[in-house]
Structure formats: structure tokens, C-alpha cells
């Protein structure tokens, strides 16, 4: 017997019982995005490898350790996208969307990183990203955070997420801070773990978010990033904080929040939760005003964020069990009799035409009434329509409310109005 082929470790199948809650959550996210006037952009899963090296930074963990990179038959180096911002910027430049224009975009789809699989973190994961181009004030930063706060309210998880903010300043200010931080770390090199020693020169700001508690204790005496901010970045951050306070959005300033990708400047933020065990990031982003020019376009301010959907789904299921998936089926059509199946299928099409938002499933494969009603229950239907030979001949249908057990016979022409009342 041939050996079964299984999914690659860290790349998961999502079965019908799981995808229903995903669809409801994604529908909620998309509805809110539409209410703010944001438009969808669809991007390739595979990009040229240099795009990510230039955008993310060659000495980041993503590029050094986590990318799925391969050569195609032409000898070109290609990479499965590890994140969406670089591809979105590339598309904006390529199609002339960014120069002297304002764009508010979102995308959704799979990303790929070769990480150690664990709860809420996988090698293929689904991400929703939002990117805004052409606006440089703190007001658009605030709008993005307000948009995410609306998501949490709609999903019923507001009490289980907390906002952390920081400003990492201009590129010049960050370079000055980098020098001061490296000088401090050199004095205490013997107290750094191997990973932090490696990052000390290649990407020293990443030492700030080390998970090593001894390193975190050492950093209490390190230079503070906030002391090195340029005046323009200070004003921008103060403006953002003022807008969030006016909107009633609570936040904590975390001066060790730097984000893991090289393209960020000024505002960085994360929504975090402790409701999935240890603290985890639900959604994160910030400004990247230099990235468009860095990738070959004309300079354009930009800000955005991304959210891993696996972790969001886990969080919603953990803290808001009342947020359930909608039933797969509203109405189940039961047919009985040798010549009723054709009539039942034709009648089902009439009902779908009259009630386009209703989910109606027709019984197939025969079976007596008991078996067909059991199938209706399995699919979660709240109403059954019953067509037997006598109903077909009379132009009628039996409508049974599966919640109350009550049933009535109505004309086939009048069934749509009856169902509207019954289904609410």
C-alpha cells in the first residue's frame, strides 16, 4: 500500500467545521474596512527575492533564517512572500498608484516563514494587511489604530487586547541612538546571550525586544530611544497620542518597542494579548516613510499594519464563544416520492431566486423522511421544506419550523413570503 502523503509541517488544512468561523471573522474585518473607505488590492504570493532583501533588511531574522527562497528554471531567485508590505509597495510603484496620490489599501492571504511551528504561529499563515500612502500626519496613524479598535469591539475582544506605542524617530535620529546603544552593549557584552551578541552590530535595536529576562534587566540602564528623537518625530508622536486620548483609546508607551523590520520610522504600535497564554502580538505596524523611495519609487509617506488571522481566530474563540459561525444551511428541502426529485430541484431554484440571501440545501441520495430530517439537523437548518407527490401535484409545500416543530402547508407561489416571516 502506498504511503499517505501528509501536509507539510506548519502548513495546515482548515476543514469545513473551521472555515465557517474564519468566514464570519473575515467578513467582519472587511465590512469595517469598507466603512472607512479602504480598497482591496490582490498581490502575488511569489516575488523576486531582492524585493524582500531591500525592503526588510538583509540582517533581519526574516531574511537570514525564515524565507522560503528557490531558483526557478530561468535561474531567477524567487521567494514565497514572508509579509505583504513590500509586495504592496512594489505593486504601487509598478502601476503608478503612489506618486502624488493618496491610497488606502488592504490585502488578505497566505504568507510563509520557516519558523518553529507553535500555537498561533505557523510556516504558512494567513495575514490581513492595511497600507496607506500619501499621508504623513499623525491623524492617519490614529485612524488606523481607531479602525483596529473598531474591529475588536465588533469581535467582542476589546477587553482582551492592549495597545502599545512608541516612536523610533527619523532614520538619522535612530542612527544616533544605534551608536549609543552599541557603545552601551559593548560595555556589557559578557552579559548578553549569543543571539544578542550576534545582533549587537547587525541589528542592535532588536536587542531591545529580547525575550531573555537577564538582558531585559540590563537594558533598564541602557540609553533610552526617546532621548534621541528629533523634534519633528516628537511632535508627530505627541499629536498621535493626543488624537488617541480624544478618541478614548487607552495606550501604553513602550520605549523598547521597535518592530523587527528595518523599514519602520516614527510611529510603531502593537496590539497585544495575554489571553492566549504568554503575551502575544495580535496586530502590529507603523510608519515606513522611506520604503517607497528605497524600492525605486518617488518618495511618498506611508503607514500600515498587519494582523495574523490564525492568532485572531484563536483569540475570538477563547474569549468570546458567543461569536459563532453562521449555520451552513438555513433551509433543507426534503423530497419524497419516485418522481419528486426533479420537481424539488426546480422548486429550490425558484426559492433561491426569490430569497437570494438564504442558504438552501436540497436533499440528494434519497432516504426516508427520518433520514432526511436527520440530515437537516446535521447541517443546522432551522426550516425544512417538504415536497411529496401530493404537494407537487397540488402546487404546495409543507414548511416545518425545526426549532418549534410547528408546520404548515402553503402554496409554492406564497412560500417566499412565508419564509421571510419565519426566518426573520
UniProtKB/Swiss-Prot annotation:
Q: Does the keyword Cytoplasm apply?
A: yes
What's a single GO MF annotation on this record?
A: histidine-tRNA ligase activity
Q: Which UniProt keywords apply?
A: Aminoacyl-tRNA synthetase, ATP-binding, Cytoplasm, Ligase, Nucleotide-binding, Protein biosynthesis
What SUPFAM superfamilies would the database entry show?
A: Class II aaRS ABD-related, Class II aaRS and biotin synthetases
Q: Catalytic activity annotated for this protein?
A: tRNA(His) + L-histidine + ATP = L-histidyl-tRNA(His) + AMP + diphosphate + H(+)
Where is it mostly found? cytoplasm
Coiled-coil region list: none
**One GO CC annotation:** cytoplasm
EC number(s) in its UniProt entry?
6.1.1.21
Single GO BP term: histidyl-tRNA aminoacylation
Source taxon at top rank: Bacteria
**Which InterPro entries does the UniProt entry name for this protein?**
aa-tRNA-synth_II, aa-tRNA-synth_II/BPL/LPL, Anticodon-bd, Anticodon-bd_dom_sf, His-tRNA-ligase, HisRS-like_core, HisRS/HisZ, HisRS_anticodon
For whether the record's keyword set contains ATP-binding, the answer is: yes
Where is this chain's protein located in or outside the cell?
A: Cytoplasm
- Subunit and partners: Homodimer.
Which family is annotated?
Belongs to the class-II aminoacyl-tRNA synthetase family.
Sorted alphabetically, which PANTHER family does this protein's record hold? HISTIDINE--TRNA LIGASE, MITOCHONDRIAL-RELATED, HISTIDYL-TRNA SYNTHETASE
Name of the protein in question: Histidine--tRNA ligase
- The protein's gene is named hisS
Amino acid at each position: 500500500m502506498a504511503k499517505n502523503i501528509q501536509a507539510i509541517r506548519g502548513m495546515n488544512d482548515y476543514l469545513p467545521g473551521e472555515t465557517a468561523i474564519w468566514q464570519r471573522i473575515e467578513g467582519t474585518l472587511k465590512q469595517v474596512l469598507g466603512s472607512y473607505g479602504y480598497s482591496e488590492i490582490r498581490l502575488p504570493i511569489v516575488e523576486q527575492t531582492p524585493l524582500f532583501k531591500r525592503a526588510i533588511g538583509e540582517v533581519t531574522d526574516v531574511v537570514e533564517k525564515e524565507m522560503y527562497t528557490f531558483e526557478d528554471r530561468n535561474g531567477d531567485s524567487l521567494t514565497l512572500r514572508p509579509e505583504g508590505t513590500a509586495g504592496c509597495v512594489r505593486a504601487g510603484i509598478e502601476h503608478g498608484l503612489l506618486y502624488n496620490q493618496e491610497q488606502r489599501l488592504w490585502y488578505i492571504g497566505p504568507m510563509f516563514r520557516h519558523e518553529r511551528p507553535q500555537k498561533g504561529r505557523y510556516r504558512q499563515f494567513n495575514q490581513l494587511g492595511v497600507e496607506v500612502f500619501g499621508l504623513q500626519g499623525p491623524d492617519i496613524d490614529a485612524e488606523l489604530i481607531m479602525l483596529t479598535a473598531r474591529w475588536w469591539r465588533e469581535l467582542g475582544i476589546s477587553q482582551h487586547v492592549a495597545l502599545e506605542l512608541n516612536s523610533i524617530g527619523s532614520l538619522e535620529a535612530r542612527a544616533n541612538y544605534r551608536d549609543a546603544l552599541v557603545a552601551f552593549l559593548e560595555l556589557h557584552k559578557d552579559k548578553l546571550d549569543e543571539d544578542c551578541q550576534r545582533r549587537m552590530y547587525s541589528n542592535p535595536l532588536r536587542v531591545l525586544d529580547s525575550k531573555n529576562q537577564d538582558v531585559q534587566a540590563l537594558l533598564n540602564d541602557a540609553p533610552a530611544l526617546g532621548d534621541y528623537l528629533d523634534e519633528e518625530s516628537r511632535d508627530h508622536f505627541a499629536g498621535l497620542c493626543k488624537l488617541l486620548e480624544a478618541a478614548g483609546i487607552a495606550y501604553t508607551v513602550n520605549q523598547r518597542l521597535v518592530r523587527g523590520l528595518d523599514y519602520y520610522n516614527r510611529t510603531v504600535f502593537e496590539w497585544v494579548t495575554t489571553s492566549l497564554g504568554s503575551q502575544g502580538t495580535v496586530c502590529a505596524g507603523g510608519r515606513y516613510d522611506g520604503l517607497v523611495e528605497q524600492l525605486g519609487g518617488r518618495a511618498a509617506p506611508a503607514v500600515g499594519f498587519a494582523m495574523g488571522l490564525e492568532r485572531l481566530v484563536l483569540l475570538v474563540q477563547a474569549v468570546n464563544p458567543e461569536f459563532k459561525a453562521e449555520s451552513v444551511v438555513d433551509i433543507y428541502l426534503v423530497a419524497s416520492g419516485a418522481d419528486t426529485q426533479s420537481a424539488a430541484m426546480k422548486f429550490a431554484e425558484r426559492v433561491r431566486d426569490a430569497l437570494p440571501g438564504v442558504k438552501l440545501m436540497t436533499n440528494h441520495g434519497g432516504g426516508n423522511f427520518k433520514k432526511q430530517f436527520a440530515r437537516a439537523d446535521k447541517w443546522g437548518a432551522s426550516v425544512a421544506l417538504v415536497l411529496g407527490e401530493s404537494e407537487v401535484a397540488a402546487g404546495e409545500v409543507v414548511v416545518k419550523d425545526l426549532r418549534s416543530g410547528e408546520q404548515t402547508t402553503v402554496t409554492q407561489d406564497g412560500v417566499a413570503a412565508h419564509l421571510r416571516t419565519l426566518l426573520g
